[in-house]
Amino acid sequence: MSTIANDLIDFYYCGHSLSEYNGIIGDIGGGDAVGAVEIGNVLNLNPVELKSLKKRKSTAVTYDGYVEKQFSFFKNLCKGSDGFYTREEVSEIIRWLNQPNYEKFTPVYSDTTWPRVHYYATFNIQPITYMGNVIGFQLSMTTSAPFGYYDEVYLSGHGILVVDDTSEEQGFIYPVCSITASMNGHIVFKNSQKEEDVTIIANCKEGETITLNGEFGTIQTSMPHANLYNDFNYVFPKIWNHMDTSMGTNSFRNIFDVNLDGSLIEITYSPISKFGLI
C-alpha cells in the first residue's frame, strides 16, 4: 500500500476541491483514542478494458477493497474550525467522494513547478475518530489506468492537420475527431502514421459534421443521415506515438488528411502522462 507524500496540499474531484470543504491534507499521528472506522461502500470496481490501451471502465461494483494510493485529510483549524465534523458534514463528504464510477481527480501540489496531471479515480473512505468524534478521513484511491493525463489539447485545420503527440506512453490514443465536409461526397480520412487504417464515411452532405469517438465506439452527425451506420467502415482515427526501430528515434508526428478539399478537421485528446502521483 503506497501513500501520497506531503507535497499534496489540495485536490479537485467531481468538480469540487477539498478546500471548498475546509479540508487540509495531513497526518494526525497515533494514540489509542485515534482510529479509522468503516463507512460508506468499500468499492471494488469490476473493470473492462476499453479500446484505448490499458484503460478501464467500470461495469459493476462489488464490495471489497483494492488500494493504489492512500492519504488523509482533516478540518483546517486556521479557518476557525473546532476540528470536528458534524453528521451532516460527514454525509456531504461521503456523497462527494464515494462515487461508483471513475471520476476526474486533479492533485494540487505545494511545488507549483509540478505539471498538472489528471486521473480518473474512485475513493474508499474511512472516517478518523477521536473520542467518538469524526476529525478526518482516510482515503484509499483507485485509478482507471496506470497513468494520468495532461490537459486536453484541441487542434483544427482545413484539409490537413498535423498532431505532434506529447504522450509519454508508446502506442495509440483514440481522440475525439470531427470532420465537417466541404462538399457532398464520401469522406476518406487517413493518418500518415498508419496509412492502411483508412476511415470512410459515405454519402456525406456539404456542411455535415461527423464526430468519431473511438474510445467509446460512437459516431454522430450534425445532419439527418439515414444510413450513417451502414455508410461508416468503423475504422476510428488514432493518434500514434512509438519508437521507429528503423530510424532509432521517436515517431510522434501524425499527419491527418481528408480527401474532400477544405474540409474542417478537429481533434481533441488528452496526452498520456507517466509523471505519477507524488
Description of each model-found segment:
Residues 51-84, 133-147, 250:
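Oligomerization/assembly interface segments of phage tail-like spikes and tubes
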Residues 3-13, 103-107, 186-190, 219-221:
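Short polybasic amphipathic segments
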Residues 99-147:
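Short beta-strand and beta-hairpin "edge-sheet" elements
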Residues 149-278:
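Intrinsically disordered, low-complexity segments enriched in serine, threonine, and glycine
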Residues 1-47:
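Polar/acidic, low-complexity leader/linker segments enriched in S/T/G and N/D
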Residues 18-29, 115-123, 197-204:
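Short amphipathic beta-strand/extended segments with alternating polar/hydrophobic composition
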